[in-house]
């Protein structure tokens, strides 16, 4: 297996080597637990209650015997939360994308995908065998110009975008995209993994858009909702279709009931506490005040994803490792997660952070960045 050694050597030489880190005695400043619900007492208590009632796992796929009242109740809650008719659960965001996209388009169809979409979208498009065209990030003029010239060549067209982009934190213009879809008869697939609970209920709610039959809303339970798994929301017709066609749903064991119960409780907490989003914005501003003290090159779009741009892969890894020595973990994000030369430290805001935590972050940055140009 010499080839594996050689490939790993190449990865290390390019400063792209990855490894898992046990975060013991370290403060995490890059998790996706944006609202701090992962350890919320009510979420944990509800999960434990259902764990004792229903057991550890679901025991089967949804289409065999792994579909319980807890799955259905979560689906109903998600559909209501997203303003759609229906919903279906998936084992993860990756499984949702690689299962749903190939069910919607195939050979003879066209996918138009934003260049910064998540890797699971890229793989879902590959599996679909539809023709793919990647458009420049949020360049909707390019997108529309292509459709003007080429829409009639294809049977079905699916436009795909993250709503909040996972590595930059900026927001897609869903108003513009819905206008394009209506004018050129396209479906719109929005990935709301980092959107649900961070800018409101979701992108449609944020932009004041009523759900239409051509809009497919995908999201995860594992970010702001603090749980695990994913979902797709849409019309009842669409969901019935996915239950019959999405292979990653059909051939996967369903989520544990306790996970579903915890996610449902998290949504209820968000609904009961609308100011959580406002508190998150305040936490983001506190982080920005720290970053400003060090004249760092960062991006901020009023979402909890605040990447510190370093650009050079080797330097990004060095800063990450130095921060880790100080007890602060901010992951170095490099190619292929982001384009080459766009390496960054993916700092995120969370309601978990106390004033003491942010002071700790500030002191660590001061030590590590001292003397850096």
UniProtKB/Swiss-Prot annotation:
Pathway the protein contributes to: Cofactor biosynthesis; biotin biosynthesis
One GO MF term attached to the UniProt entry: 8-amino-7-oxononanoate synthase activity
Record PROSITE patterns: AA_TRANSFER_CLASS_2 (PS00599)
Gene Ontology biological process terms in this record: biotin biosynthetic process
Residues reported to bind substrate: 18, 118, 337
Coiled coil (UniProt feature): none
Chain positions with N6-(pyridoxal phosphate)lysine modification: 223
Leading EC class: transferase
Documented EC number(s): 2.3.1.47
Cofactor(s) this protein requires: pyridoxal 5'-phosphate
Binding site residues for pyridoxal 5'-phosphate: 93-94, 166, 191-194, 220-223
Keyword Protein biosynthesis: no
Catalysed reactions, as listed in the record: 6-carboxyhexanoyl-[ACP] + L-alanine + H(+) = (8S)-8-amino-7-oxononanoate + holo-[ACP] + CO2
UniProt keyword list: Biotin biosynthesis, Pyridoxal phosphate, Transferase
Keyword Transferase: yes
Highest taxon listed in the record's lineage: Bacteria
InterPro entries: Aminotrans_II_pyridoxalP_BS (IPR001917), Aminotransferase_I/II_large (IPR004839), AON_synthase_class-II (IPR050087), AONS_Archaea/Proteobacteria (IPR004723), PyrdxlP-dep_Trfase (IPR015424), PyrdxlP-dep_Trfase_major (IPR015421), PyrdxlP-dep_Trfase_small (IPR015422)
Description of how the protein assembles with itself and partners: Homodimer.
Physiological role: Catalyzes the decarboxylative condensation of pimeloyl-[acyl-carrier protein] and L-alanine to produce 8-amino-7-oxononanoate (AON), [acyl-carrier protein], and carbon dioxide.
PANTHER family hit by this protein: 8-AMINO-7-OXONONANOATE SYNTHASE, CLASS II AMINOTRANSFERASE/8-AMINO-7-OXONONANOATE SYNTHASE
Family that this chain belongs to: Belongs to the class-II pyridoxal-phosphate-dependent aminotransferase family. BioF subfamily.
Protein name per its UniProtKB record: Putative 8-amino-7-oxononanoate synthase
Gene source species: Aquifex aeolicus (strain VF5)
């Amino acid at each position: 297996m010499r080839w594996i050694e050689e490939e790993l050597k190449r990865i290390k030489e390019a400063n792209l080597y990855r490894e898992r880190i046990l975060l013991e005695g370290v403060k995490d400043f890059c998790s996706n637990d944006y609202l701090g619900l992962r350890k919320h007492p009510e979420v944990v208590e509800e999960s434990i209650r259902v764990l004792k009632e229903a057991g550890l796992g679901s025991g089967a796929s949804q289409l065999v015997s792994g579909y319980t009242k807890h799955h259905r109740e979560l689906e109903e809650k998600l559909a209501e939360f997203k303003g759609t008719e229906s919903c279906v659960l998936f084992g993860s965001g990756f499984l949702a994308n690689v299962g749903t996209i190939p069910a919607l388009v195939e050979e003879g169809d066209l996918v138009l995908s934003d260049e910064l979409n998540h890797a699971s979208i890229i793989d879902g498009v590959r599996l679909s065998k539809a023709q793919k065209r990647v458009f420049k990030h949020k360049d909707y003029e390019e997108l529309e110009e292509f459709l003007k010239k080429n829409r009639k060549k294809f049977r079905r067209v699916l436009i795909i975008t993250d709503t909040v982009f996972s590595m930059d934190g900026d927001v897609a213009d869903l108003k513009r995209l819905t206008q394009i879809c209506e004018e050129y008869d396209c479906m719109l697939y929005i990935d709301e993994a980092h959107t649900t609970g961070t800018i409101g209920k979701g992108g449609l709610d944020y932009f004041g858009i009523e759900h239409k039959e051509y809009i497919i809303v995908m999201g995860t339970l594992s970010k702001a909702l603090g749980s695990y798994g994913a979902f797709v929301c849409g019309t009842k017709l669409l969901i019935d279709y996915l239950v019959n066609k999405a292979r990653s749903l059909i051939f996967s064991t369903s989520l544990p009931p306790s996970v579903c119960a915890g996610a449902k409780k998290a949504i209820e907490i968000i609904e009961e506490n609308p100011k959580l989003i406002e508190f998150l914005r305040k936490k983001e501003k506190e982080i920005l005040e720290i970053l400003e003290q060090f004249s760092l090159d960062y991006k901020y779009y009023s979402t909890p994803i605040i990447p510190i741009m370093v650009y050079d892969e080797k330097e990004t890894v060095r800063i990450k490792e130095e921060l880790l020595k100080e007890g602060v973990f901010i992951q170095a994000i490099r190619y292929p997660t982001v384009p080459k030369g766009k390496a960054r430290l993916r700092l995120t805001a969370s309601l978990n952070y106390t004033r003491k935590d942010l002071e700790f972050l500030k002191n660590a940055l001061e030590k590590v960045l001292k003397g850096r140009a």
